[in-house]
């Protein structure tokens, strides 16, 4: 299960977005089973945008690439989507983290293209509300625990298996943990 192409964020008690996104799902085997079709039918009946996928592992790694770069850069550099579209350190680190996920996905047997980060930034980022923000930045602003362990933590841990360095994810892990540690101060 994955969600795609969404820039939803919460402003007080209201959800704000330019792109509502869709739910992507499928069997690990890639087979389009009756179970997958039943989920698609149910979501259709509920009016929920969805995409049954024969390549769900690819979609999940792609989603990790986006979250790992976008969410962590927004949180670490205190930037909305519009700020991450601008050239500079935040965008450079976002891209570097995305590249680490692309390399790791390839080592894990999932062939994300080497320019997958650029494709996302060029195709999707312009559609996001410039004042919008991903969930991890919302967490930091609300002083809630973030998903840094699920993003940088997982990437760092899995990369160790291959002896792959992860300087961007190391930076994000350290920086976001520092931010979280400062919540009580």
Question: What is each residue range found by the language model?
Answer:
Residues 45, 93-185:
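NAD(P)-dependent Rossmann-like dehydrogenase/reductase catalytic/cofactor-binding core
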Residues 4, 62-64, 167:
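Short, surface-exposed loop and linker segments with low hydrophobicity and enrichment for Pro/Ser/Thr
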């Amino acid at each position: 299960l994955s969600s795609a192409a969404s820039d939803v964020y919460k402003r007080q008690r209201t959800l704000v977005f330019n792109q509502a996104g869709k739910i992507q799902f499928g069997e690990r085997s890639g087979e389009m089973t009756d179970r997958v079709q039943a989920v698609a039918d149910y979501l259709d009946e509920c009016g929920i945008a969805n995409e049954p996928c024969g390549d769900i592992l690819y979609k999940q790694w792609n989603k990790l690439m986006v979250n790992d770069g976008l969410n962590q850069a927004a949180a670490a550099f205190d930037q909305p989507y519009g700020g991450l579209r601008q050239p500079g350190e935040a965008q450079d680190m976002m891209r570097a983290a995305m590249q680490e996920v692309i390399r790791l996905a390839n080592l894990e047997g999932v062939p994300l293209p080497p320019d997958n980060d650029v494709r996302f930034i060029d195709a999707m980022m312009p559609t996001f509300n410039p004042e919008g923000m991903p969930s991890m930045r919302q967490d930091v602003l609300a002083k809630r625990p973030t998903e840094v362990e699920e993003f940088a933590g997982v990437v760092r841990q899995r990369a160790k298996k291959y002896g792959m360095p992860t300087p961007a994810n190391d930076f994000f892990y350290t920086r976001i943990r520092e931010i979280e540690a400062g919540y009580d101060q």
